[in-house]
C-alpha cells in the first residue's frame, strides 16, 4: 500500500502536483484545479494543526470506515463529503493565484511528510496512528489528483 511514509510515494504525489495546470478540467465534482489544490492544502494544514476535531456522523462505526478507506485497495468514491472547514466556502479557504496556491500546498505537503509520530483523531475515522495518517495523506491527494486526471 502506498503511503507518504515511503519517499517514493511522496515523490510521486509531489510530481503529480507539479504537473497540474489551472486549465485542467475536473472529471467529477465542482472544483476547479485551483480550488482543489487549496482544498488539499487545507486538509494537510488541518491534519497538522492541534485543533479540536468535530466528528462526522456516518452510518458505520469509525473503525469500519477507516478500514474500508485506508486498508482496501479500492479508490475512494467520487464526490464524497468533507468536513465544513474544508468546503470551498469555508472562512479559511482562501485561493489566491494558482502558482502561489500550489507552492503553499507543496509546503504543507512537505511539512506533513516530515512528521515522524503523528497521532490525532480524524473526523470520519476516529483514532489515527501515524501510519494511518501517512496512508490518508497519500490517498486524499491521489483521490483529488485523479479527479483532475493526474
Predicted regions and their residues:
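Short, contiguous alpha-helical
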Residues: 23-71, 111, 115, 119-150
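Short, helix-capping/interhelical loops that line the mouth of catalytic, cofactor-
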Residues: 49-104, 112
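Charged catalytic carboxylate motif
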Residues: 12, 39, 104
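A short alpha-helix capping/helix-coil boundary motif
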Residues: 11, 102, 119-121
Amino acid at each position: 500500500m502506498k503511503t507518504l511514509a515511503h519517499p517514493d510515494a511522496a515523490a510521486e504525489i509531489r510530481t503529480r502536483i507539479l504537473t497540474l495546470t489551472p486549465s485542467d478540467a475536473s472529471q467529477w465534482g465542482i472544483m476547479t484545479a485551483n480550488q482543489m489544490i487549496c482544498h488539499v492544502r487545507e486538509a494537510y494544514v488541518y491534519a497538522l494543526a492541534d485543533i479540536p476535531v468535530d466528528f462526522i456522523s456516518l452510518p458505520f462505526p469509525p473503525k469500519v470506515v477507516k478500514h474500508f478507506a485506508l486498508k482496501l485497495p479500492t479508490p475512494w468514491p467520487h464526490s464524497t463529503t468533507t468536513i465544513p472547514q474544508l468546503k470551498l466556502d469555508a472562512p479559511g479557504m482562501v485561493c489566491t493565484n494558482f502558482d502561489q496556491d500550489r507552492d503553499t500546498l507543496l509546503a504543507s505537503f512537505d511539512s506533513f511528510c516530515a512528521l515522524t509520530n503523528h497521532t490525532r483523531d480524524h473526523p470520519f475515522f476516529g483514532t489515527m496512528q501515524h501510519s494511518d495518517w501517512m496512508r490518508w495523506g497519500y490517498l486524499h491527494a491521489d483521490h483529488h489528483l485523479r479527479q483532475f486526471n493526474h
